Each structure stands twice: as C-alpha cells, then as structure tokens.
C-alpha cells in the first residue's frame, strides 16, 4: 500500500510540474494599434521608409516584391521591415495588400492582413495578426496606413 501511495504522489507531483511549466510558456496576448507613414521610393522605386506610431512605435519600411492588377484592382506582394523604438525587430511573413483605384494614381487598401512570426527582444517567439486600412498615392509616393490587431508574446511577457 505504501508503494502505491508513493507512486500516486510522484505522478501527482509530475502533473503539477508539467502544468506549471505549460502555464509559464503560455502566450500573453495584447491588442496593438497605430499608424504608419511612409514614403515610396525612399531607397528605390519598390521600397518605402517611414515611421510607425502607437503600440509598435519605431521605424518601418516595406519592399514591394511583385504586383499584379486587373481593372481598378492592384495587388501588392510586400515584405515588411520593422524596428521598434526600443530596438527590437519584428519579423513578418510576406503580405498581400489588395487595393482599388479611387482616383488616378490613388489606391485605397481594401484588404491588407499581416502576420507577425517573431522577432528579437520581447518579440522573440511572438506571433500576431494585424489588419490594415489606408491609401497609397503613386503620384507623390506617400503611403498612410492604420494598423490594428493582436500580438501574443512568448512566455507571457510583453
């Protein structure tokens, strides 16, 4: 009987430890939002550079990898480059922005989902999904975007 009690206690202790480890490794999610203001053509014709405000405040850029379009629709395949004010980097998956022309050279962002797949510092192991709205002015090279979404930090940190 004493052996069975010891085994039961050992199994219970192992379960408690596993639950504690799992809880420590769980992600803590918080909302994120702000604005991006960039200039297209800052480096070359396909690259923007600018600033991010809000929860992910810092410097931001994007490279247009390719485009496709039919009628008034212009689709941009984009790779983002982002460094927060504290020096952490954000690693985003390539994104697709679907826009529609609202005036000559002026495009409204219809859908623009972006997926965070990690980064450095507090963003190491973080994930998140962000949606964007805004405008691209190909006449002046100005891009303005409003972003909103959720960031889930690894280990419950943020």
Set out the residue ranges of the language-model regions.
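Bacterial N-terminal signal peptides that target proteins for export
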Residues: 2-11
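Bacterial N-terminal signal peptides
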Residues: 10-20
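Glycine-centered signal
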Residues: 3, 19-23
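Beta-strand-enriched cores of mature, soluble protein domains
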Residues: 25-158
């Amino acid at each position: 009987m004493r052996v069975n009690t010891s085994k039961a206690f050992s199994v219970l202790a192992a379960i408690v430890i596993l639950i504690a480890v799992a809880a420590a490794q769980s992600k803590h999610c918080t909302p994120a939002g702000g604005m991006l203001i960039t200039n297209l053509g800052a480096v070359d014709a396909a690259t923007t550079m600018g600033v991010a405000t809000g929860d992910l405040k810092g410097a931001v850029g994007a490279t247009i990898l390719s485009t496709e379009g039919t009628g008034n629709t212009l689709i941009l395949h984009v790779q983002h480059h982002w460094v927060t004010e504290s020096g952490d980097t954000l690693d985003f998956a390539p994104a697709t922005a679907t826009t529609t022309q609202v005036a000559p050279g002026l495009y409204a962002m219809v859908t623009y989902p972006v997926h965070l797949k990690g980064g450095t510092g507090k963003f190491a192991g973080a994930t998140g999904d962000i949606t964007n709205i805004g405008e691209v002015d190909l006449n002046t090279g100005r891009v303005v975007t409003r972003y909103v979404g959720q960031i889930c930090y690894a280990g419950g940190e943020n």
